[in-house]
Amino acid sequence: MKKVLVVRGGWDGHQPVETTEVFIPFLKENGYEVRVEESPAIYADKSYMETVDLIQQTNTMNVITKEEFTGLQDAIIAGTGFGGWHGGIADSYRNTSDYLQMLGGQFANHPGKAPEERIGEQSDNYVPHTINMTELGKNHEITRGISDFELTTEQYWVLHDSYNDVLATTTQKVRPWDPWNREITSPSIWTRNWGKGKIFVITCGHNLEIVLNPNVKTIIERGLLWASR
């Protein structure tokens, strides 16, 4: 039986427990033995990490020690898959630049509503936007058959590099209150090879409502299976 390690924690606003619980039954149905950990400390357990086929991480704005990151990266290089969504994977460990290099993208911001529409809640950052499939995405097993779709949620502005295989993008518009003066396109779904391991990232998934969106849920399910050893 294959093994999946779910590592969750960090900022509660991303509902790490509720969102990961959505996918645990799916993973079990697909033949995985599931272990759940509430911190990245398990990454430093070399003997255990060597047995893991897939890591699903939802751990936002946390920190990782040198030993923990080394264990995580060594496992991925050896063939363990690594996947997740939103800040749980793309805004996990700002203290470790090597993690950002391995992942291929880092959340920078999520430009929100017009200032006069903001009320001091998370919804200030929920804006309507489109997830646009790339030519690669139209034919990739993770996103094949899924058309461009609309969401009203946080729209991630991502710092990234050209080593990613980008399956979908989203474009930040230019609005009167924003400081930039041309549109910015960021990857919203990408994959990346690191050693023998495969990495899957989708930046949608701010909360339970968004991971339950049929398109987002399907992409996450396919992405996790794709990344697995």
Sequence positions of predicted segments:
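Extracellular ligand-binding/catalytic regions of CAZymes and related secreted enzymes
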Residues: 2, 29, 47, 175-188, ...
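Catalytic beta-strand/loop cores that center a nucleophilic Ser/Cys/Thr
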Residues: 28, 50-51, 119-195
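A glycine-rich, often tryptophan-bearing local segment used as a flexible ligand/cofactor-contacting loop or short
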Residues: 63-141
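Oxidoreductase and adenylate-handling cofactor-binding alpha/beta cores
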Residues: 99-106, 148-165, 220-229
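Hydrophobic/aromatic beta-strand patches that form the interior of the parallel beta-sheet core
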Residues: 5, 83, 167, 200-202
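Helical hinge/lid and interdomain linker segments adjacent to catalytic or ligand-binding clefts
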Residues: 5-6, 12-92
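Short, solvent-exposed loop/turn segments at secondary-structure junctions
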Residues: 11-12, 62, 89-91, 148, ...
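Conserved beta-strand segments of alpha/beta enzyme cores
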Residues: 33-35, 165, 198
